[in-house]
Swiss-Prot record:
GO terms for molecular function: acetyl-CoA carboxylase activity; ATP binding; carboxyl- or carbamoyltransferase activity; zinc ion binding. Acetyl-CoA carboxylase is a heterohexamer composed of biotin carboxyl carrier protein (AccB), biotin carboxylase (AccC) and two subunits each of ACCase subunit alpha (AccA) and ACCase subunit beta (AccD). Its main location: cytoplasm. Component of the acetyl coenzyme A carboxylase (ACC) complex. Biotin carboxylase (BC) catalyzes the carboxylation of biotin on its carrier protein (BCCP) and then the CO(2) group is transferred by the transcarboxylase to acetyl-CoA to form malonyl-CoA. This is Acetyl-coenzyme A carboxylase carboxyl transferase subunit beta. Residues 25-294 form the CoA carboxyltransferase N-terminal domain. It is found in: Cytoplasm. Belongs to the AccD/PCCB family. A zinc finger (C4-type) spans 29-51. The gene is accD.
């Protein structure tokens, strides 16, 4: 028997169980590295309260943030992707679809809904970047066109939140065709004189930026969002030159006149309501309690 065992009475020694912390309770800001409480970050609309970095947000969370509670009606939810080409790279396309559906709970990379924004009828769509990089494929194009058709039927504006890496390579020409398909649908909105507001979030690239994302009557971007066709790393390798600081970011684009506004996420809903009321010649909506009223303000920053 060791000396410590002789000193301590075994009957008085109690076993302690190591407390375990469930996964997903904490997360880290991609920009400042600050450790953040997950529930608090969700209440803050995925905006870091320390540095104001706008993290990626799910499609449904964006639409619920925008539309009045209880007014949301989903459009095109019955549409599902199909592996028409039997495509396979390092993995079968159908397996990639199944994995993405399991991870996100979505059938494809775009969610569309109709509802009201402070009482104004609107149709809204949002890309789900977690679903295969928000890539545009047949179902994405079909749902977007369904959203346009609903806006035409209801004679109301359309708002789209873009967050995509571009066209989905696994559907080849079928995905590239969606660029023309969505652009043609938006031309009908223009003919009817109905507003289309495009909100560009991080990242908006490739075929999406070359079609529906940049065709808004007003193009709004979130702060520091990456927006372009090819990525900066690809461009640098092609031209063999160093790109200027902030190239393809929202602040760079607005300086060059490529976009119209940069709006922080906490004030996005009220800003869209104000713009749409002017474009549709409706009374200016009163400032009501917003879904973002509890959003923390970053240090030394004001709303844009």
């Amino acid at each position: 028997m060791s000396w410590i065992e002789r000193i301590l009475n075994k009957s008085n020694i109690t076993q302690t169980r190591k407390a375990s912390i469930p996964e997903g309770v904490w997360t880290k800001c991609d920009s400042c590295g600050q450790v953040l409480y997950r529930a608090e970050l969700e209440r803050n609309l995925e905006v870091c309260p320390k540095c104001d970095h706008h993290m990626r947000m799910s499609a449904r969370a964006r639409l619920h943030m925008l539309l009045d509670a209880g007014s949301e009606v989903e459009l095109g939810s019955e549409l599902e992707p199909k592996d028409i080409l039997k495509f396979r790279d390092s993995k079968k396309y159908k397996d990639r679809i199944s994995a993405a559906q399991k991870d996100t709970g979505e059938k494809d990379a775009l969610v569309a809904m109709k509802g009201t924004l402070q009482g104004m009828p609107i149709v809204a769509a949002s890309f789900e970047f977690a679903f295969m990089g928000g890539s545009m494929a047949s179902v994405v194009g079909a749902r977007f066109v369904r959203a346009v058709e609903q806006a035409l039927e209801d004679n109301c504006p359309l708002v789209c939140f873009s967050s995509s890496g571009g066209a989905r390579m696994q559907e080849a020409l079928m995905s590239l065709m969606q660029m023309a398909k969505t652009s043609a649908a938006l031309a009908k909105m223009q003919e009817r004189g109905l507003p289309y507001i495009s909100v560009l979030t991080d990242p908006t690239m490739g075929g999406v930026s070359a079609s529906l994302a940049m065709l808004g009557d007003i193009n709004i971007a979130e702060p520091k969002a990456l927006i372009g066709f090819a990525g900066p790393r690809v461009i640098e390798q092609t031209v063999r030159e160093k790109l200027p600081p902030g190239f393809q970011r929202s602040e760079f684009l607005i300086e060059k006149g490529a976009i119209d506004m940069i709006v922080r996420r906490p004030v996005m809903r009220q800003t869209l309501a104000s713009i749409l009321s002017k474009l549709t010649h409706q009374p200016q909506p009163s400032v009501v309690e917003s879904k973002a009223d509890t959003v923390a303000q970053p240090e030394n920053q004001a709303d844009v």
